Amino acid sequence: MRPTPTFCTLLLSAALATAADGGKPNDPGKPVTFDARTANSGNWSEARTWDGGRKPRAGDFVQVRTGHVVTYDVESNDALRMVHVAGTLTFSREKSTLLDVGLLKIEPGETTTEDGFNCHEAAPALPTGGVVPALEIGTPSSPIPAGVKAIIRLRHFKGTNPETLPAVIACGGRWDVHGAPMSRTWLKLAAPARAGDTRVTLEQAVPDWHTGGRVIVTTGDLQGPEAGASFRSKSGRSKPVGTEERLITAVDGAVLTLDRPLKKAHRGDGLMRCEVANLSRNVVVESATPAGVRGHTMYHHGSSGGISYAEFRHLGKEDVLGKYPIHFHLVRDTMRGSGVLGASIWDSHNRWVTVHGTDHLLVRDCVGYQSHGHGFFLEDATEQWNVLDRNLAVQAFVSVPLPKQVLSYDPNDGAGFWWANGRNTLTRNVACENDRYGFHFQITKSPAFDPVLRVRGPDGKTAPQDVRTLPFLRFEDNEAHGDGLFGFRFGDEVHGSVSGDREHPFIAKNLRVWESHYAIRPNVRFFLLDGLRVKNAAFGIYHPNFDAHVYRDIEFDAVTAEPINGGHDEDSRPDGDFTYDRLTFKNCRLDRDPLVQITLAATRPGVAGHFRGVSVADSKSAGGVVDFGGGPRSNRTDNAVSYYFHDTGRGTVTRVAGVKTLDPVKHADYRGIDGWTGRDARAAEVKAVAFPQLLAPVDDLPPATLVTGIRVEAGKRVVSGVSHDNGEIATVTVNGTSAKITAQHAGVADWVVTLDATADGHYTATTIDRAGNVELIPHKFREPSSP
């Protein structure tokens, strides 16, 4: 009888299961004995590459030895127990490949252990003049080309530790993983997509998106908060999900044809435009059994390499600390200029990209889709000088705190972006349909955590610093829509505990929030919000910790509950003055609360709020423009708060206060203004009240430079990089040669320079900003050696 294809498939599956489930017991502290070792450089598929001509077999421990360069040129379902790369293992760029493996470890030395988390306490030193061990699944200058696939499939072996294996671990080696470049990995819709449509139009052509690719079309809806509910399917209390997955069947310029009609409408005009993101890449790292034991990847201190245009799917170990799809673990600045570019990370059981104890990384153009716990995550509050630019975060789900996590106060409750040290740059990112927060900056002091940490300052010196006093390096042009609770939340519940100062406030610029419950909650002291557009939300600026707060160019469109809340916590007692300049209300129709909530008493005498350039269009409320809200009210009248509206008439200022704080005789001229003041507020013209300047930001922070690449071209060295600053970049030099700035937005500048090679291969890149601040920690780097 001739075997049927189905019968053959069953036999193959059984054989693979036997290979993966049997074998030697795991002892992570004991050096492994290799079954197959390289004898010299060559192709993986050739017997002459291996000791004794014995090629690797299913279940083997395999070693690519120091000094050997091996090309991986097979597409094999034989699952290897471990591959130790002490030389160079480079994947073919000419044919598709598959490596099925339990542990892939890049580490110098002739011996290693089967540990999927820790490296040697002291990594073996390279011999003098030795080449760093390298796993190359493409390189930045020579990625795996379109049309060729490279897949790493991480498989768990019976008897190995399910908390640490399977894994890819870089222990002082170089791990490069680079797929075919894409001009954009996600884009906004250029026109609305209706339910039933099979075609969507993007804002620009996507010639490098291909048929068969998996895409998501993000939600344009808001489900609103619901205690205990999640966008995660089978969560017990699942909320309706608006984001839809489809496959591409045709690409015509900016128009995609999808394999199935859309079930929901997706917005595509004005402020409210949904995103379409491509999840597919030609280089893939995945778990062999997503429903079983999943894999993870790690870069350790002293490693090198980076990731671009690769797909990390079905990874991350649920509820296990440190086992994430992409994890930079206590790297500090030993991988400066590295990072993750254009990757997709989806169906993760534990975050997307984790930056832990690491500085000077670039995470750009990445797509994160479905994560248990926070998605793009900076772990321990010491991370600084990192750039997160133009990433998309969709569906970070509520999880639980991880065992022994560094910051015990973090509930891990589903933020697209989560960080605890302000000295990082976040620009052009979008968060959508995350369970609790689009963006959550959270830092607090607790019995289990002291925020005074040893961190490196701009001068290069490391010293104790209360990280609650470190303002945002740059937070600009970010957007949130459809998130379960907050678009943006900053700071801590404790009044004034997270604080800048008058010259160094926390600054957020040009934020956009739509289809949101709470748009923004700023619980920081000394705060500047310069540009906010909110459309279709219940609450605008919610529970602000007013104390030296400055709001400029704020627009509320169809905010229906509380556009401006009276203050922090239920007492709504401001701690200090605040100002609003150029404040617009459009289409805000409120049933109960006013457009601007006021409060009776502050925590100290003399506190005032100042408003200028207020515009009200097609908006109304039963509570008027200015009044008390409908929530709990304090009866305290000590430390009365004044609200001044400037330029309400030609050169006039109107003071508004609560009725309970006004003396009937002294304030006899105070009266209600029809359509302006509500039932419990009164107003009168006052003189000699100037609009205050509460903040005077000073740019005395040097910029930071990330060298992201160096390549040889016509005998010259072409060096490229990114510099970022809280102001604007003026110049970048490499070894004294001026670089050309090719793009600049929101304090982030891309640059390139061509120069002669140096005799010793050493280079120094330095940036100066427009305020004249010179970088004191320039990026010093050495041209990598060739294998």
Descriptions of predicted regions:
Residues 90-95, 110-111, 289-296, 316-324, ...:
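Short glycine/acidic-rich loop motifs that flank beta-strands on beta-rich extracellular proteins
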Residues 34-66, 203-214:
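Acidic Gly/Asp/Thr-rich repetitive segments characteristic of extracellular carbohydrate-active
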Residues 59-188, 207-208, 216-225, 232-250, ...:
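Extracellular beta-helix/beta-solenoid repeat scaffolds
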Residues 50, 145-147, 151-161, 226-227, 281, 291-300, 305-314, 336-349, ...:
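Right-handed parallel beta-helix
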Residues 34, 60-62, 68, 76, ...:
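The right-handed parallel beta-helix/beta-solenoid scaffold, focusing on the short coil/turn
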Residues 201-203, 216-218, 718-724:
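Short edge beta-strand/loop segments characteristic of extracellular beta-sandwich folds
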